[in-house]
């Protein structure tokens, strides 16, 4: 259906037929229409059921309560902000409900909107520059929070120099940037000192490979 769609409505119908896997599908046509749909057959459990844990398959109490109509799937069709994007980030709530999923942190999505929002005259060169952008809009905010909890009177000269570098950092990750190295080492040591003693070395190593750790 998607391959033979002749209109936005045809394409949307094709997307609605995808029960699994859950995908972010982008659409654009020569008429200026843009759209984004999240695919997948979504469902609801009874209140109190947490699908992140092992459920009771015998009682029926933990079974799926209902499957939702495709109209309840997260989407944006010709939005007022005139563009669509996805960085596999958490969509906004629908009917007051945030759909669970293995989403990525907001870093890329936040940077994408930061670049797209103020500009409307995009061309090939501008898009190419955005594709290779390596700036985090989240990391500098994290740095502010970290520094606010540091007793700077007890720091060595080298540590004070590191803080100065971080304070001046705008979030870029260029080849010769020193700040990203300091930042990532600080984050690693923070996580290590917080979690490794509870998780153990092996589980902590596994924990570092998940997206959960990026959202702390």
Q: What annotation goes with each model-predicted range?
A:
Residues 2-19:
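Alpha/propeptide regions of enzymes that mature by internal proteolysis
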Residues 18-20, 68-69:
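Short solvent-exposed loop/turn micro-motifs enriched in small/polar/acidic residues
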Residues 21-27:
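Bilobed periplasmic-binding protein-like "clamshell/Venus-flytrap" ligand-binding domains
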Residues 29-216:
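Long, compositionally biased non-active-site segments enriched in small/hydrophobic residues and glycine
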């Amino acid at each position: 259906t998607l391959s033979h769609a002749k209109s936005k409505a045809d394409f949307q119908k094709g997307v609605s037929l995808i029960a699994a896997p859950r995908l972010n599908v982008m659409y654009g046509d020569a008429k200026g229409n843009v759209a984004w749909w999240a695919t997948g057959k979504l469902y609801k459990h009874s209140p109190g059921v947490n699908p992140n844990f092992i459920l009771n398959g015998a009682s029926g109490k933990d079974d799926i309560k209902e499957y939702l109509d495709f109209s309840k799937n997260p989407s944006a069709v010709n939005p007022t902000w005139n563009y669509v994007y996805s960085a596999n980030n958490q969509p906004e709530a629908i009917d007051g409900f945030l759909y669970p999923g293995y989403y990525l942190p907001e870093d890329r999505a936040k940077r994408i909107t930061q670049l797209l929002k103020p500009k409307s005259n995009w061309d090939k060169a501008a898009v190419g520059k955005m594709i290779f952008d390596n700036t985090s809009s989240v990391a500098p905010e994290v740095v502010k929070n970290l520094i606010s909890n540091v007793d700077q009177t007890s720091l060595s000269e080298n540590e004070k120099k590191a803080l100065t570098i971080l304070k001046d950092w705008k979030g870029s990750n260029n080849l010769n940037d020193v700040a990203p190295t300091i930042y990532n080492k600080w984050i690693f040591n923070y996580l290590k000192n917080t979690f490794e003693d509870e998780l153990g070395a092996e589980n902590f190593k596994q924990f570092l490979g998940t997206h959960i750790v990026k959202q702390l």
